[in-house]
């Protein structure tokens, strides 16, 4: 599939903006997937190519967080393994199952996340008592989060962030950093199988990845500099926008 320089420039810009937002609050796919579909790209190709550029953004942000020692990989390794395995299963199943039921319930879930962050102003203000062990988190939640990202994906960054805050007791900055590494892991797993299935347009994906690398790095720097005062309102705003977008796509506002 050949695209003109103007279209590639538009996709580069879309990836840059999406990755910046995604590094802070998640939801970048709301920008990049519609942008890819606007080019006339088949949906499967759009999803696979989006995973490539999203992987670049997640990698850029994760490297920044790791350099700042915001993530402890040795403690999180089993969680990342279960996320990887869950994402592999989800990616394989989405190629053979209908995701309609999940799509119908998703606006309610994303809205609930936004409302939770909005109505709990002290959420993630500081580290709190850990409610479950890393092992239990990995087995019960890591695998599910990975599965969801591989199977469908929208809002997974916000879900990972919320899980780290409420279950592991992380503050919002720490939770956002760990959520990005979790997202990197699930993206990598999905990308492998989209590649095997021939659903990645590399020229487009690499152009977008370049924009994503830059945007995600800037977003990660903002997270470390501004912390909760930036993350919380961004999560709320992105959650509400995602809810409206998904509800519109399902025809809720068509009269």
Task: Identify the residue ranges that each predicted region occupies.
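Hydrophobic residues within alpha-helical transmembrane segments
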Residues: 13, 17, 52-55, 59, ...
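Transmembrane helix-loop junction
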Residues: 38-39, 91, 95, 104, ...
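Hydrophobic alpha-helical transmembrane segments in multi-pass integral membrane proteins
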Residues: 144-154, 190-198, 242-255
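Alpha-helical transmembrane segments of integral membrane proteins
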Residues: 5-9, 48, 101-108, 136, ...
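Selected transmembrane alpha-helices and immediately adjacent juxtamembrane segments
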Residues: 1-42, 127-176, 206
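Membrane-interface alpha-helices at helix entry/exit sites of multi-pass transporters
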Residues: 41-50, 73-78, 169-180
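Transmembrane helix exit motif
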Residues: 60-70, 107-132, 241-255
């Amino acid at each position: 599939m050949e695209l003109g320089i103007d279209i590639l420039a538009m996709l580069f810009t879309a990836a840059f903006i999406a990755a910046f937002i995604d590094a802070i609050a998640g939801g970048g796919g709301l920008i990049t997937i519609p942008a890819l579909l606007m080019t006339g790209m088949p949906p499967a190709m759009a999803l696979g190519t989006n995973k490539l550029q999203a992987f670049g953004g997640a990698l850029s942000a994760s490297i920044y967080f790791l350099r700042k020692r915001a993530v402890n990989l040795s403690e999180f390794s089993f969680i990342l393994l279960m996320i990887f395995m869950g994402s592999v299963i989800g990616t394989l199943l989405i190629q053979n199952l209908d995701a309609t039921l999940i799509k119908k319930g998703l606006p309610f879930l994303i809205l609930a996340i936004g409302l939770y962050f909005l109505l709990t102003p002290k959420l993630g203000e500081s580290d709190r008592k850990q409610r479950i062990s890393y092992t239990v988190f990995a087995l019960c939640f890591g695998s599910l989060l990975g599965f969801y990202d591989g199977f469908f994906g929208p809002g997974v960054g916000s879900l990972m962030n919320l899980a780290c805050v409420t279950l592991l007791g992380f503050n919002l900055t720490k939770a956002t950093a760990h959520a990005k590494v979790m997202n990197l892991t699930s993206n990598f797993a999905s990308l492998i199988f989209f590649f095997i299935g021939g659903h990645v347009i590399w020229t487009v994906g690499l152009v977008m990845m370049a924009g994503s690398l830059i945007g995600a790095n800037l977003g990660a720097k903002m997270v470390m500099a501004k912390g909760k005062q930036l993350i919380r309102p961004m999560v709320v705003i992105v959650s509400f926008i995602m809810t409206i977008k998904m509800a519109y796509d399902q025809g809720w506002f068509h009269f």
